[in-house]
Amino acid sequence: MKVLVINCGSSSLKYQLFDMTDESVLCKGLVERIGIEGSKLTHKVNGEKLVVEEPMKDHTEAINHVFDALLDEKYGVIKSLDEVSAIGHRVLHGGDKLTESCIIDDKVKDKIREFIKFGPLHNPANLMGIEACEKLAPGKKNIAVFDTAFHQTMPAKTFMYAIPYEYYEDYRLRKFGFHGTSHRYITLRTQQLLGKEDINIITVHLGNGSSIAAVKNGKCYDTSMGLTPLEGLLMGTRSGDLDPTVMTFLMNEKGYSADEMNQILNKKSGVLGVSGISSDFRDLEEEAEKGNDRAQLALDMFIERVKRYIGGYMAELGHVDAICFAGGIGENSSSMRKDILDTFEELGVKLDLEKNNTREEALISADDSKVKVYVVPTNEELMIARDTLELAK
């Protein structure tokens, strides 16, 4: 069985086609600048690539070009769309109503629309991708896999906000959490590595967007992101946790609207805002080595925030089997992992510095560490493909 996985952004689209007999990737690609001048599709297969530069005014035209690439005489990997058993879609926000992956129908689409208020950039784009596939491949099963789903096992004491309770009842204002597909993949893989299902672990997904989850007995117990992906850790451009009065002060002092304030906190803050240089952690490490104090400050603030969450989740869980690093930074930066965990020895977490020097899946803790530490490269697309295969049977 072949499964197509699609991840739609507001002006971009990523895709991968899987052969689920061995979970291999047959091809993958990216469509950029949808609805903007300079639309481009880059399709990769067997180390070769096909580049298509044509106007693509919407997601339907973009997905039509994706289908053409899949069927291309030279760069294609299928002879007919009939070979694709189902299409899996990453959907940002399912709220507390769509708590697991599901076959998409009109009711599901209505619920995705309902949560546009909490995912105004992503949910509309996710819907456009779904509706384009329904139009271009009628009769094909479309499956939704939600970023929020894994976290819906959190108890009320970890997902509620301490604001008047009627705001929760009237507007569902609560923590939902994100990167759930990644945290679920890491959890399932760590269950295999530890040889048991009832595991207590801390999953640390660090990239330009970052989040941490506390997993208790194999289920999400708490997570750092909140109602939206803005809460929690410092990120590339997101502020993370912040005294809300900072916002009201700036709105009063500078005359910012709520939308402008949202833009500042989501797009101009985080390590970019602190450093004034870049949202890319590699750039900051380079600048810090040259003696740039603000670059170093941004990195230090990021590390301290990660430490705070890991330490807090260790207290919440009581017993911790493992801490698992994933994401672009979590998987690739041995120095970041070392700096994050260098104060945890008293809590039973000890790195083996030689083993830590890796970018592959590995156990990187010392033999005498009470808590195991792993690098577990995440694979959200494969997780979506697996769910799609299961539901499409």
UniProtKB/Swiss-Prot annotation:
Chain positions recorded as substrate binding sites: 90
Pfam families xref list: Acetate_kinase
Catalytic activity: acetate + ATP = acetyl phosphate + ADP
Gene Ontology CC entries for this record: cytoplasm
Necessary cofactors: Mg(2+); Mn(2+)
Pathway annotation: Metabolic intermediate biosynthesis; acetyl-CoA biosynthesis; acetyl-CoA from acetate: step 1/2
Molecular function GO terms recorded: acetate kinase activity; ATP binding; magnesium ion binding
Active site: 147 (proton donor/acceptor)
Binding site for Mg(2+): 7, 380
Annotated compartments: Cytoplasm
Presence of keyword Lyase: no
Enzyme Commission number(s) from the entry: 2.7.2.1
Residues binding ATP, per UniProt: 14, 205-209, 280-282, 328-332
Cofactor note (record): Mg(2+). Can also accept Mn(2+).
Coiled coil location: none
Site feature location: Transition state stabilizer: 179, 238
Role description: Catalyzes the formation of acetyl phosphate from acetate and ATP. Can also catalyze the reverse reaction.
Protein name: Acetate kinase
